């Protein structure tokens, strides 16, 4: 069956929408169960079990504890062998002290909605291909997708998509910066600061020197790059030479390529501070957040479906160029790691919150009925574009060619 003929039928779009509508109450239950039981990074045991069990009970093949993370899962579904593979990412971690103030409960059920509606189409029309739901924990400061990517996740997939709630606007794509965090520990030698200071090696001096040098580096940064940092510990008593100090820093850049250029100027600062103070230093680079490389082919199709078939007015969903202006901000998402492996988009949907993500106002809106309905509508659009990937060769080739060109420009293409 020619895939484009399927999608030109209003009947198939109706089937996608209907499959989600038939399960909207169950999806609402799952969303609220995640929302009411917030679990922070890499401790999402209940949410992981809830979602993976639900898919398994529908007949999906589920693996848990995958790609290096105990609370990650991968669920697969296919009817006819062969074909392409599309993936929907589900997030479910919460924020410490704030709960689901980033709306990850909505991300999870939006991806489930996409998956089960596409499942219905594959069954009814015997469409070749594989649907994957990837359970991705630890997005908030843990870089969960980066960890999973380094362990082989998303390799061989043809497309990967997800959605994210936003305060009061929607976009067919998002722009994020690349970011890398580093924890720095200086080890000195304790001594009494009054009676024998010459015997000490001051770790506090080391972290202060490092912090000052980082501040001096800022004037040399290119536009769009930034450095943030804080001193976490630098001694306990004024009359004791501190033998331990610790700081946390992060560097941000428009792309991971620019981040790689900045890192060699940033990292030597810590060894220099240690050498100058007679201390030793331990430098631990933690989660890498790569910039999101949005696939325009997918994003344009997402917007078209939203406006032409899913009831959104053109003024409610900016064009791609308008979106790049609207969502040009310094935030980060670990979805960037996925977007360097296969074509993808992370669309945004309005939840009519009183404040931006990571706020009480956003948390309150994330459990609301309006947010739930918008998450499901975004799930409908993602299902439709992924059905295009599975069934429309010309569309899939265009998407792939764009991805290859983007990776070549980023110096990341390895045929």
Where are these regions (language model features)?
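Acidic/His- and Gly-rich active-site-bordering loop/insert found
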Residues: 2-131
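A short small-residue
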Residues: 6-11, 29-33, 92-96, 185-194, ...
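Short Gly/Pro-enriched turn/cap motifs at secondary-structure boundaries
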Residues: 63-66, 138-139, 172-176, 325-329
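Histidine/acidic-residue-rich, glycine-tolerant segments that coordinate divalent metal ions
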Residues: 71-76, 93-101, 105-106, 114, ...
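Structural motif
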Residues: 84-87, 130-132, 158-161, 344-347
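Non-cysteine beta-strand/loop elements that form the S-adenosyl-L-methionine
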Residues: 87-89, 183-187, 346-351
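Metal-dependent amide/peptide-bond hydrolase catalytic core
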Residues: 205-415
């Amino acid at each position: 069956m020619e895939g484009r003929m399927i999608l030109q039928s209003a009947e198939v779009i109706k089937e996608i929408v209907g499959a989600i509508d038939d399960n909207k109450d169950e999806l609402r239950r799952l969303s609220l169960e995640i929302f009411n039981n917030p679990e922070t990074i890499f401790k999402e045991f209940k949410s992981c079990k809830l979602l993976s069990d639900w898919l398994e009970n529908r007949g999906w093949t589920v693996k848990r504890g995958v790609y290096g993370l105990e609370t990650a899962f991968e669920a697969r579904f296919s009817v006819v062998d062969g074909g392409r593979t599309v993936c929907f990412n589900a997030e479910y971690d919460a924020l410490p002290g704030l709960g689901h103030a980033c709306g990850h409960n909505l991300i999870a059920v939006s991806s489930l909605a996409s998956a089960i509606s596409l499942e219905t189409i594959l069954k009814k029309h015997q469409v070749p291909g594989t649907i994957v739901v990837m359970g991705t924990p630890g997005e908030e400061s843990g870089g969960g997708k980066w960890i999973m990517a380094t362990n082989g996740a998303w390799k061989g997939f043809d497309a990967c998509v997800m959605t994210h709630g936003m305060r009061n606007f929607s976009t067919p794509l998002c722009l994020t910066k690349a970011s890398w965090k580093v924890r720095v520990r200086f080890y000195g030698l304790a001594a009494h600061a009054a009676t024998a200071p010459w015997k000490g090696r001051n770790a506090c001096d080391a972290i202060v020197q490092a912090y000052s040098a980082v501040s001096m580096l800022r004037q040399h940064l290119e536009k769009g790059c930034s450095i943030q940092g804080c001193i976490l510990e630098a001694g306990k008593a004024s009359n004791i030479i501190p033998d331990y100090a610790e700081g946390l820093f992060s560097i941000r850049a428009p792309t991971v390529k620019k981040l790689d250029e900045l890192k060699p100027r940033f990292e030597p600062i810590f060894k220099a501070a240690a050498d100058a103070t007679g201390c030793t230093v331990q430098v631990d680079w933690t989660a890498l957040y790569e910039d999101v490389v949005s696939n325009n082919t997918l994003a344009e199709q997402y917007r078209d479906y939203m406006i032409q078939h899913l009831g959104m007015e053109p003024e409610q969903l900016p064009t791609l160029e308008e979106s790049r202006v609207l969502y040009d901000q310094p935030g980060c998402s670990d979805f960037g790691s996925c977007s360097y492996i296969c074509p993808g988009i992370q669309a945004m949907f309005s939840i009519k919150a009183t404040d931006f993500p990571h706020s009480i106002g956003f948390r309150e809106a994330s459990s609301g009925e309006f947010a739930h309905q918008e998450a499901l509508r975004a799930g409908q659009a993602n299902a439709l574009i992924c059905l295009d990937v599975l069934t429309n060769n010309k569309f899939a080739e265009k998407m792939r060619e764009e991805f290859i060109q983007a990776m070549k420009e980023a110096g990341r293409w390895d045929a």
